[in-house]
Amino acid sequence: ETWSYNMVPPIVPGFSFNQVRSSSRVGLHPQLVDYNLLKSDGAHVGLNDDSTVAPGASITYLWYAGDIVPNKKGTRIVGIPHEFGAIALEDMGDVIKHASHGAIGALVIEPQCSRWDEGAGSKAQVEITYWKPEAVLSRHGKHLKRKICPAAEPNLDSGKLYRFKEMVLLYQDNLSVQQYGQPVPNLRNGDDSEDSGQKGFNYRTEPLWARLGASAADEPETMSQFDWSNVLSSTVPHFRCEADFVNKKYCDPETPIFTAKAGEPVRFRVVHPGGHPRQHGFTLFGHDWVPSPWVDASKTMGWNQDGLTRVGSAGGIGPGRDVNILTTAGGDCKVSGDYLYRTQEGFMFGGGLWGIFRVDENPGLRWYQPAWAWAGNLFGYETNGVASADVCKVQALNNAPVVQP
């Protein structure tokens, strides 16, 4: 046990985070998937069997990525597969302290007939290639053991393969972190216990106060004395980081730096497995997406033709919540460069909840601007009847890339 500044609401008088001993039992509790509640819930609730596990022991959970329902005659169960995307995995062995010490996770349900290639040095970024299952009459609702994918993978040039880049990002907002052997104090701007603890993404954090050489507990008056103008830049020196642009030594944040080529389809999986009930807003600069990317009666993900709204920020992200963002690297105009992703709460952003989405140039794409597209068009002025989507166009100089539908 280590002492922490992390706090919880005062459930009983004198109750605090540091007065609770961590449980030695752990479990994996999923959402959305179907399973036997008595054996694979990953929790110990009421009169149900305990499906958590003690130190030195193991347990196997069986989950189905979809709905399990009886057939019309009630003679057997049938499975209806669902592409859920990202799902939070919670440790229900100790809902108070385990997430604070890193016991979190996510389950990603990919499209049917998928394979994935992990990026170098990170399992949070992969390239997904998938092809649609064989067109079998009444495929949905068949027996669970029925084979649904083709026997062989289609050729790359067959037009039947689809590909996207996937980035998984886990919120952590109740971390018990130490510096120089001492617990890091809470951010001075926090409002109550829901804001306590340190912040991070994927076991990484990059507090702005640390980049400035300040302390988490410094008063706002003290913080206002620092020069914030280049605090997000990777090309200028920061506290304990000497950037050298000529020799390509950069002061990048410790939080995940996701990469993709301009024009490449990408899916951000943003998950908050467990922590404080303070909700977050996630923003990806320079990009937008449809809030509900569901098609095929909400069984798969894709371009939702009925989704008329496009947003650049997703709110209401609390414990157990997930957001699936389907967009294009570099935005509609497929522009390369570094794009900021961050949480929208100001002091939590300063506490480390931000990072970089690095979009590299794509030699297979060429951007051009039509002659009519002057600056006024970009700000909603008269477009002479030309659709705003034509402000930028991209032409392929080589074979068209494999994309998602």
Regions found by a protein language model. Give the residues of each.
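Copper-binding active sites and cupredoxin-like electron-transfer domains
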Residues: 1-405
